[in-house]
């Protein structure tokens, strides 16, 4: 098929890097001339829509001595080639999807090549070659029996809409055996915080298997040292599928973009999470997602939206470290006649956090509460949040989750419906943590209207920024 270069340029009028995209697709046409190109509407996880270039066709896969033509569809984002394509199987009415390491129930394709996409070394031809190689190891489709073909209509309609709910229609599930008794934890990110979380979790002996996903290029020192000195039960990998069947997935990664504006910096984090969260959610569909990336309130919201997990299974580290420190200071430094467990730091991380008590007025009088709070907060302000401190706090939360301890932590949870907050924002609130994440939000006593106002102000500013992000 002759490649219509000028026609493609017209279709890509709104693409940021049109010439680079056209040149790459010209190269794709050399190897796969039968692909058909069109401009159609893609529906993202947040229900937003965008007209995107996509191409369809088949790729030849040799499996057990037979050649299969696997139908695929690639969606090219308007930021291509700096963002990877979104790839799907395109089954016909007599084909079913085999859910596996690289394919979910809706036919979306997940590959290491996509996860590690980096222009200019990553190209579509290279992606297709890896796709063929992976499908030769694990065929992604099977022929339906005549009785199943009628039910296939639902899946085809679903794929046509390009939405991403949870469905097992005409799909065969993969390897559930690891999900029975193993306490498997995954830490995403090989930076200082990722290393700190890995060491703290390892030291507490929480995990039977602990996976550290180091997504950086080359040897970055710390992860190399972990490989050299070989911690028991710790696996270091760059393949997201190594995280499969984790009970908790911890996000510590942050984009180090050179953007000038705060919005651009946050958006670069969002762009990175768009490539990570759906894949990690696919590999560990029953996990709790724990976010330590910054800004934690916004990135927890982003993770929730991209994962489509229920809100109770997506939490951020919030003010847990500050709360634990504050309780320790009140009990052990100020020697107050209270356990300290009635006081919490809640709200937004940083300068806008607030202090509250959990409704046990009879334990400490209001006057004493104010005096203790002021003195404790002064001591707390001199404490920094070093990576190792945050790592210890994360390990404590993970312990509560995997061992179902029903312990109260101040974590970033969906705050809608609390303190007259009506928007979908995450703020740190005292929550009981267990196997399924947040099982209950603890009510606190807010005697001062200024505290409620501060929480609502934080919610408003966070919501405003979220509205400007592109998910």
Swiss-Prot record:
Looking up InterPro entries in the UniProt record yields: L-lactate/malate_DH, Lactate/malate_DH_C, Lactate/malate_DH_N, Lactate_DH/Glyco_Ohase_4_C, NAD(P)-bd_dom_sf, UBQ-conjugating_enzyme/RWD, UEV_N
Q: Which family does it belong to?
A: In the N-terminal section; belongs to the ubiquitin-conjugating enzyme family. UEV subfamily. In the C-terminal section; belongs to the LDH/MDH superfamily.
Q: What does the tissue specificity note say?
A: Colon, colon carcinoma cell lines, normal cervical epithelium, carcinomas of the uterine cervix and peripheral blood leukocytes.
The residues the entry assigns to the signal sequence are none
GO process terms (BP): carboxylic acid metabolic process; endosome to lysosome transport; protein modification process; protein transport
From what superkingdom does this record's organism come?
Eukaryota
List the CDD domains hit by this protein, alphabetically. Answer: LDH_1, UEV_TSG101-like
Q: Which intervals hold domain UEV? A: 2-145
**Species, as recorded:** Homo sapiens (Human)
Positions the record marks as coiled coil are none
UniProt-recorded Gene Ontology molecular function terms: oxidoreductase activity, acting on the CH-OH group of donors, NAD or NADP as acceptor; ubiquitin binding
One matching Pfam family? Ldh_1_N
Print the keywords alphabetically. NAD, Ubl conjugation pathway
- Residues reported to bind NAD(+): 191-219
Q: Which SUPFAM superfamilies match?
A: LDH C-terminal domain-like (SSF56327), NAD(P)-binding Rossmann-fold domains (SSF51735), UBC-like (SSF54495)
Q: What does this protein do?
A: Possible negative regulator of polyubiquitination.
* GO CC terms in record: ESCRT I complex; extracellular exosome
Please describe the quaternary structure of this protein: Homodimer.
Question: By what name is this protein known?
Answer: Ubiquitin-conjugating enzyme E2 variant 3
């Amino acid at each position: 098929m002759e490649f219509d270069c000028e026609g493609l340029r017209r279709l890509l009028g709104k693409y940021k890097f049109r010439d680079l995209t056209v040149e790459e697709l010209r190269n794709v046409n050399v190897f796969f001339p039968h692909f058909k190109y069109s401009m159609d509407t893609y529906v993202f996880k947040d229900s937003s829509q965008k007209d995107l270039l996509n191409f369809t066709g088949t790729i030849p896969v040799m499996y057990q001595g037979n050649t299969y033509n696997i139908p695929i569809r690639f969606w090219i984002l308007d930021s291509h080639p700096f963002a990877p394509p979104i790839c799907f199987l395109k089954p016909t009415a007599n084909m079913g999807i085999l859910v596996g390491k690289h394919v979910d129930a809706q036919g979306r394709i997940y590959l290491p090549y996509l996860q590690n996409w980096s222009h200019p070394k990553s190209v579509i031809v290279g992606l297709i070659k890896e796709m063929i190689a992976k499908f030769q190891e694990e065929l992604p489709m099977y022929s339906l029996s005549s009785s199943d073909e009628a039910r296939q209509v639902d899946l085809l309609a679903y794929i046509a809409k390009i939405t991403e709910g949870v469905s097992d229609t005409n799909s065969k599930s993969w390897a559930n055996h690891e999900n029975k008794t193993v306490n498997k934890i995954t830490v995403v990110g090989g930076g200082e915080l990722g290393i700190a979380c890995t060491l703290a979790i390892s030291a507490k002996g929480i995990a039977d298997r602990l996976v550290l996903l180091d997504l950086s290029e080359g040897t970055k020192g710390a992860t190399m040292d972990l490989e050299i000195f070989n911690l028991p039960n710790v696996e270091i990998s760059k393949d997201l599928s190594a995280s499969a069947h984790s009970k908790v997935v911890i996000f510590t990664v942050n984009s180090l973009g050179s953007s000038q504006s705060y919005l651009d910096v946050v958006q670069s984090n969002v762009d990175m999470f768009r490539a990570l969260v759906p894949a990690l959610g696919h590999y560990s569909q029953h996990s709790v997602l724990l976010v330590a990336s910054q800004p934690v309130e916004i990135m927890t919201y982003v993770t929730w939206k991209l994962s489509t997990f229920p809100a109770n299974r997506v939490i951020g580290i919030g003010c847990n470290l500050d709360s634990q420190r504050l309780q320790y200071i009140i009990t052990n430094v100020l020697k107050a006649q209270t356990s300290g467990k009635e006081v919490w730091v809640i709200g937004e991380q940083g300068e806008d956090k607030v202090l509250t008590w959990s409704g046990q007025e009879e334990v400490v009088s209001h006057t004493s509460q104010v005096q203790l709070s002021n003195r404790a907060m002064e001591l707390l302000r001199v404490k920094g949040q070093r990576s190792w401190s945050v790592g210890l706090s994360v390990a404590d939360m993970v312990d509560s989750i995997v061992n179902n301890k029903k312990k109260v932590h101040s974590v970033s949870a969906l705050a809608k419906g609390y303190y007259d907050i009506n928007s979908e924002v995450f703020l740190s609130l005292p929550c009981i943590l267990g196997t399924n994440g947040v099982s209950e939000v603890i009510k606190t006593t807010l005697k001062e209207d200024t505290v409620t106002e501060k929480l609502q102000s934080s919610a408003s500013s966070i919501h405003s920024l979220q509205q400007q992000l592109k998910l």
